[in-house]
């Protein structure tokens, strides 16, 4: 199994239906050597194959295989800011949220000893960029939660996030407003502790 095989499998995905994503994700799951190529293809940002690669990368990271991304954290965090297809940004925003959840977990894990300050900064910086530029609701929702979680350790993040939510996001769709209100309540709750 090589990169060309993975490209062929990705091209065979007709749409984002679960069964299509499951089929290709299972191929990668059963041939872990393809994961390197999956990360690489996710960041071919001018090629639409990156969208399908991002879908599968998200599936892998949200179905118990998040640690597989550990050796690729540099590549992932350095390149997420270059994504420009909406359908590739959303899955990567969700992966960022998953990374933030695991990193800030009370349960000791590999991410806490592997994820660097530079990598966190790259995720945070990209997250703020995603919040100030036009993005889909899901990207905003995942990103607000990611920034809240990393803001538990970076003092400057909560006030910036709070400002963005109150001045911009709260004036957007009902979904953004609801998630923004939830994140604001988490920030306030944490400030009282």
Where are these regions (language model features)?
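Alpha-helical scaffold domains
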Residues: 1-193
């Amino acid at each position: 199994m090589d990169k060309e095989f993975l490209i062929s499998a990705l091209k065979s995905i007709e749409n984002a239906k679960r069964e299509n994503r499951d089929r290709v994700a299972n191929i990668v799951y059963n041939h872990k050597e393809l994961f390197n190529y999956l990360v690489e293809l996710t960041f071919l940002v001018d090629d639409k194959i990156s969208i399908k690669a991002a879908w599968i990368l998200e599936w892998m990271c949200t179905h118990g295989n998040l640690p597989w991304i550990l050796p690729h954290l540099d590549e992932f965090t350095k390149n997420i800011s270059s994504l420009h297809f909406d359908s590739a940004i959303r899955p990567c925003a969700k992966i960022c949220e998953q990374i933030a959840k695991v990193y800030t977990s009370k349960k000791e894990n590999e991410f806490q000893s592997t994820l660097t300050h530079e990598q966190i900064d790259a995720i945070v910086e990209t997250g703020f960029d995603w919040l100030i530029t036009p993005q889909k609701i899901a990207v905003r929702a995942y990103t607000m939660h990611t920034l809240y979680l990393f803001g538990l350790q970076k003092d400057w993040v909560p006030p910036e996030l709070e400002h963005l939510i109150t001045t911009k996001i709260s004036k957007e769709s009902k979904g953004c407003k609801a998630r923004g209100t939830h994140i604001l309540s988490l920030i306030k709750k944490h400030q009282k502790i």
